[in-house]
Amino acid sequence: MNLQHHFLIAMPALQDPIFRRSVVYICEHNTNGAMGIIVNKPLENLKIEGILEKLKITPEPRDESIRLDKPVMLGGPLAEDRGFILHTPPSNFASSIRISDNTVMTTSRDVLETLGTDKQPSDVLVALGYASWEKGQLEQEILDNAWLTAPADLNILFKTPIADRWREAAKLIGVDILTMPGVAGHA
């Protein structure tokens, strides 16, 4: 089972404060473990424009049609001071990993310098921090009914309102997550 470019969808019974009702986009999954970014937990009072200001990045030339007031996500409980930018191609930045044909993760400053300009990738999600699972840990959590999985959908990742992403991700596999019981069994 390789869940790269998939969503993890928290089951209703998962009550961990960080992962409760979360949607995690899996960026890497292999025999050593998994790494992902939570895509539906906005950080309070932190927008992309705020990150650019803190880093003293001024978009030039500024394209006013590109909104920089989008929230920054809490990507996960690890390295919360590090930025992870999920975006559509191109992937010609200093530190980019192509996750799928249509999704790239970049951790270098050069992608931030394109935000708000005509060089910005068409779709962007900025997160601080990430989530990680050791070898076999994620698979066990799935067996323990902590997570549903679904192939990633770029519309949900980049365009669906943040508050709707949990429910919409579950709908990808025909589940109305809001009507699920708090505890699930095994069939």
Swiss-Prot record:
Classification via HAMAP family: UPF0301
GO cellular component: cytosol
Organism: Escherichia coli O1:K1 / APEC
Family, as annotated: Belongs to the UPF0301 (AlgH) family.
InterPro entries (UniProt xref): AlgH-like (IPR003774)
Upper classification of the organism: Bacteria, Pseudomonadati, Pseudomonadota, Gammaproteobacteria, Enterobacterales
SUPFAM superfamilies in the record: VC0467-like
Protein name, entry field: UPF0301 protein YqgE
Signal peptide from the UniProt entry: none
Pfam families: DUF179
Domain of life: Bacteria
